[in-house]
Amino acid sequence: MSRTMLLAASAALLLTGSCYQSSPDASRQAPPASYYDNSGHPDAWSGGARKITISTLKGPHQVWIKRVGNNPKLKLLLLTGGPGLSHAYLEVMDSYLPAAGIEYYHYDQLETGESDRPNDPDLWTLARYVDEVDQVRRAIGGTKDNFCLLGHSWGGLLAMEYALAHQDQMKCLVISNMMASIPAYNRYAKTVLEPRMNQAALKQILSMEASGKTEQPQYMQLLMPNWYEQHILRRPAAQWPEPVLRAQENMNRRFYVTMQGPSEMGASGRLVNWDRFADLKTITIPTLVVSGKYDTMDPAYMAAMAKQLPHGELAATNGGHMDMYDDQPTYFARLIAFLRKVE
């Protein structure tokens, strides 16, 4: 998303003061006192935040994490989307997971947010990011008895790759709003979503993509009402939450374009041929698949993923790609129920 469009959305938010809000269920029980016991944690003196040194083929780098809560039976690591987005937009978890007594970790992957940004495309491979996640797991004390991953969008892709390599070190997996195939994702956009769009706007969007004008303000001005507000976060841009705007404004655009491609309506970068659907049957840990009715991810395909997984479970929401915002009641009720069940 362009800085111009983000500033416009931010200004509209300030003027209207009408950010969408959904309050957590006040009837939920408070977590036990032990949830707030920070003794023994290396981040106890810093509000849960710290940096972890990871090793790469290009030398050591530091990545930022922040722990919330204390629950030895369940450590949930959050993998953000993009690629290139920071942890900021998943701060919505702070409104729900503490009351459920879930220990979880915000995390900026290398090249994003508060983590190091070496700006080195040689480090932008799935295998290296899988290794990075494994180093973070070890640093937070994650084991097969307590470690769970929640990956959203690109983070869901990364979570699937991690599970295929290291499910012996996992307790559970949450695939949030990510299909197991980029070719299938592209087909859904081209054959289902694009025909439903305003065709005059679509023609302009495709023309700008073909001529390499995706960084111009007009591109996002067309995409915001015709794509983002329909499929990404189903609220007017003036109501988009501040954490979402902050994550987008701080996005590593070069990383995103290299992996995803310049188009917002399909992938053409390094991930273009990624497909793991056939391998899902080998993931035997409990897995929740979250699917939004209006998402850019095909709901029927997401349902098939849940069936392909031996212990898969589908959570169908009435939201878009960020249904943790635009259908919070369903998203968090299903997520928390799943985590409590595997805990």
Could you say what each language-model-derived stretch is?
Residues 38-62:
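N-terminal cap/lid segment of alpha/beta-hydrolase-fold proteins
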Residues 61-117:
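Conserved HGGG/HGGXW glycine-rich cap/lid loop of the alpha/beta-hydrolase fold
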Residues 109-150, 154:
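Active-site loop/oxyanion-hole signature of alpha/beta-hydrolase fold enzymes
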Residues 145-188:
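Conserved hydrolase catalytic core segment
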Residues 173-214:
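Flexible "cap/lid" loop of the alpha/beta hydrolase fold
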Residues 203-281, 285:
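Alpha/beta-hydrolase
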Residues 277-319:
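Conserved loop-alpha-helix segment in the C-terminal half of the alpha/beta-hydrolase fold
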Residues 311-343:
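Catalytic active-site module of serine/aspartate enzymes centered on a nucleophile-bearing elbow/loop
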